[in-house]
Amino acid sequence: MTQTQATRIVRIGSAHGLHARPAKLFAQAAKDAGIPVTIAKDGGTPANAASILGVIALGIDQGDEITLSADGDGAERVLDSLSDLLAADHDA
């Protein structure tokens, strides 16, 4: 299998940002992806996307642009799915 690396910039859609509920949904999806995924805000230090505490600690608000990176088989597909999750408004 071929190792691939992918990166996406995504604008956060949830009205209240990545608070507990959307952060939990996102972190669980990142964990279920089975490959390493990181999330970073404003070009800062990347956090493990599968860690709900790491995601919440970034203080991501609605409209923030974040960078997702994944490394492994299916990285493009994984980031497509995670990007859709982050762009959706889970507070609607």
List each model region and its residues.
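Long, contiguous binding/interaction regions
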Residues: 2, 24, 28, 75, ...
